[in-house]
């Protein structure tokens, strides 16, 4: 069983914001990307894609996931990019956005592969941040480890955003109380403007309303 860290006991480098979006927008994103079955996902045999680079690593049969890459310039721009526009206004200079869906694997919470999102050789000085937005409620977690070895466990609460230094080692933990654990991973540069999300009420609501109508058999239909 995971011992979640009280958000009041987190260091300043880790930022947690609950109720980050309006409920309708969160419900739409969760329905479309986790529940609807309408999104094409690439099946990755590692949550970090690191098997080829470290073939002698400890095998973890549960360490796989579905991935939908939304944004990674200059080559990847999914049509879904427009549905994440409110996030891009808050997280400046977003380098990467992808939706991860993990599958239930047994009745024990298990850690996925620990990693940093970018290699320092690619980003000298490591001046970037990672953020995770949880699409649904579940008893999984994100484990974050600072350079001093201190470990924090962030519970996967729907509509929660957690942001932290991208060079800090982190990993997800599997959920045992849902079939699918959905989260959106962002890598960005610059200072985030969290307050702007509250100012985008109409934008969030319009995306949610139009998006739900475009999906087959939306909730409540």
Across the structure, where does each feature detected by a protein language model lie?
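Catalytic core of non-heme Fe(II) oxygenases with the double-stranded beta-helix
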Residues: 69, 74-207, 215
